[in-house]
Swiss-Prot record:
Domain characteristics, as noted in the entry: The CXXC zinc finger mediates binding to CpG-DNA.
ZnF (CXXC-type) residues: 122-163
Name of the encoding gene: cxxc4
Matches recorded under Pfam families: zf-CXXC
Family matches, as PROSITE patterns: ZF_CXXC
Localization terms from the record: Cytoplasm
Species this protein is from: Xenopus laevis (African clawed frog)
Known function: Acts as a negative regulator of the Wnt signaling pathway required for anterior neural structure formation. Ectopic expression induces ventralization. Binds preferentially to DNA containing cytidine-phosphate-guanosine (CpG) dinucleotides over CpH (H=A, T, and C), hemimethylated-CpG and hemimethylated-hydroxymethyl-CpG.
Binding-site list for Zn(2+) 2: C141, C144, C147, C157
GO cellular component assignments: cytoplasm; nucleus
Protein name (database record): CXXC-type zinc finger protein 4
Amino acid sequence: MHRNDSQRLGKPGGAPESLQMANNNFLSTLSPEHCRPLAGECMNKLKCGAAEAEIMNLPERVGTFSAIPALGGISLPPGVIVMTALHSPAAASAAVTDSAFQIANLADCPQNNSSGAGGNPAKKKRKRCGVCVPCKRLINCGVCSSCRNRKTGHQICKFRKCEELKKKPGTSLEVRGDDSFFPCLASSLIPPFSPPFQCFLSPFKMHHSFSESPSRL
């Protein structure tokens, strides 16, 4: 009996060899090279199933989706909000609140800028005309208060101050009668006009005071 058993075990075509071949075939199908893709697919399926379950349970954890504003109006990317909602409902609600606050601030900014622009209009700086006698004067008198306080004051000489700048900003520019025709001549040197022409110039004529003449300097 012992000899027959040993012969059976030692035979090349016996049962032990067939079992060994079956085991080898089974192990070859489950080799690491074949197991890695199968394991990756299994893990992917498990992750997808877990993600679908979390998404299905998301309304119960966070609330209804109606409380979340449209994804186009949120400053944060939609994926960030969804991932935050999956991990922490409180953080998701805080992110949604923060996004709504940012949207409200952006909506208020143009209104504030427009109100500020309407309340403080830019003032237009007036310029010298360059035609009147004070504008043509090139030398300061050195006697008036503006010239005496040149180190502390910032006003121009009184004899060089433009006639247009002396007027109030609301008044319109008036047309000068005699000076418009003879800007370089004094009023005493202008010849008298005929009565009809004087009647025509009377509404536009301006009376300039030459009391402070350059001869006094």
